[in-house]
Regions:
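Alpha-helix boundary recognition
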Residues: 30-31, 76-77, 119
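Short beta-strand segments
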Residues: 33-67, 73-75, 81-87, 94-98
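Charged, gly/pro-rich active-site loop segments
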Residues: 1-20, 94-173
């Protein structure tokens, strides 16, 4: 489980009586979300944003995509990405932004675990077989990626808005 090394409320963007959002609350939003958005960087440095399904598991965000899709092509060139989720209600809610690097998951045991988690969360439409270091289903092959957080931001809206920042240990390499 990835745990933050620091938690900080940014007073510039928070009510004077706001408190930092707990990491547990942030993880709950990430885990319970059904739709996420991912931003990747194209070869020419233009951003690419798209909705997708995914999992928050063991302190990382996991998703799958076809190897020919734009986000997969972008990640091969530049692994930097941002994943976000939340709600679209101005008066209340908690939005979470995860900044990190996407790494391809190829280990069979991990892929089998993730395939089961996708099935549990999203149902039979997202049932995958694992072979050749990827997910497979009638729609074709899907590569699986994992985004371990470098930084996470939480944005609370409502009567006591606040912005919390969580920082994580730099990954080796």
């Amino acid at each position: 489980m990835t745990e933050p090394v620091s938690t900080e409320l940014d007073s510039r963007f928070s009510a004077s009586d706001a408190k930092p959002t707990s990491w547990e609350d942030a993880q709950r939003v990430l885990s319970d979300a059904r739709i996420y958005w991912i931003t990747t960087v194209r070869h020419d440095l233009r951003p690419h944003v798209t909705p997708l399904i995914g999992l928050w598991i063991d302190g990382s965000f996991c998703f799958c995509t076809g190897p020919g899709e734009q986000k997969a092509k972008n990640i091969v060139d530049n692994s930097n990405c941002v994943v976000l989720t939340g709600c679209n209600i101005y008066e209340a809610g908690l939005d979470i932004v995860v900044e990190g690097h996407a790494e391809r998951v190829v280990e069979e045991a991990r892929l089998l675990t993730l395939a089961e988690q996708f099935l549990t969360k999203y149902g039979d439409e997202w049932r995958f077989e694992v072979r050749e270091s990827a997910f497979h289903h009638e729609g074709g092959e899907a590569w699986v990626f994992e985004v371990a957080p470098d930084k996470v931001l939480g944005f609370v809206r409502g009567d006591r808005p606040g912005q919390t920042r969580w920082l994580f240990e730099p990954r080796p390499g």
